[in-house]
Design a protein with these regions (language model features):
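RNase H-like nuclease fold core
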Residues: 10-14, 18-133, 140, 208, ...
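Compositionally biased, low-structure terminal segments
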Residues: 3-4, 80, 181
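Acidic/histidine-rich catalytic cores and adjacent linkers
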Residues: 24, 115-153, 157-237
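Single conserved hydrophobic/aromatic residue that forms the stacking wall/gate
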Residues: 1-12
Length: 237
């Protein structure tokens, strides 16, 4: 009957939850071992590369405890690293990353960055990486990398997402996006300022100006990452 089915379903869910917990614990142990190796200068990574591309993002997840009761949302930090793109597959119109490795966790930012650096050291000779290019969504925790010389770029997808979410006028969206795509950050910020002022309204329900200023503040806060490295005159091997 239905009560029996629900009971079996609950048992199955608990079993899956337990398996996932054990798997997570094992992965965490491996990550901690890599951190210890890094601090002891015994990391396994030997490969030397001219450039390492890194991407970091935060994803907010709805959480449940073992009894499937709702818990407050937590941010899962996601890190992806790769050496570049497969030239042959690019010619065929397919994008494929070379040497892609991922890491994810719910730790505090300091601990996550420690595991992230250990993940890099497990695969590469970190001291011999010529340049590190870091793409991120602008989250505050992303600005805490081990390598202060990493070049930061604001992730284009998140910029487009912010423009669409904060600017209601389609024409203004296109103008802002075009200024961003053509590498004109100063003109873009000025345009948003003018737009935000032009849509001010005495109607408290009209949030157009407020949202435009929020977009401005987001981009201004991440000003250093608005231009991709190649448009800054930075050459990498």
């Amino acid at each position: 009957d239905s009560s029996t089915s629900r009971g079996l379903g609950d048992v199955y869910k608990r079993q899956v939850w337990n398996v996932m917990q054990r798997l997570g614990e094992r992965i965490s142990e491996e990550e901690e071992h890599a951190v210890k190796q890094m601090h002891a200068d015994q990391s396994e990574g030997k490969k030397e590369i001219p450039v390492l591309f890194e991407e970091m993002d935060g994803v907010w997840l709805s959480m449940q405890d073992e009894q499937h009761k709702k818990m407050k949302k937590q941010e899962m930090k996601v890190f992806t690293m790769y050496e570049g793109w497969d030239a042959e597959k690019e010619k065929q119109g397919r994008s494929s990353l070379v040497g892609k490795t991922m890491l994810a966790g719910m730790e505090k930012s300091k601990k996550f960055h420690e595991k992230r650096e250990a993940c890099i050291c497990k695969k590469y000779d970190a001291d011999e990486i010529g340049q590190r290019i870091l793409n991120g969504d602008g989250g505050s925790w992303i600005y805490e990398p081990y390598d202060p010389e990493a070049i930061f770029q604001l992730d284009r997808y998140h910029v487009y997402q912010e423009i669409t979410g904060k600017i209601r006028d389609k024409k203004a969206q296109r103008e802002i996006r075009e200024l961003f795509d053509t590498g004109k950050p100063e003109e873009m910020l000025e345009y948003i300022q003018i737009y935000a002022t032009s849509v001010e309204s005495p109607d408290e329900k009209d949030k157009s100006s407020q949202k435009a200023w929020e977009l401005y503040q987001y981009l201004e806060h991440n000003r250093e990452g608005l231009l991709p490295y190649d448009k800054r005159g930075i050459k990498i091997a």
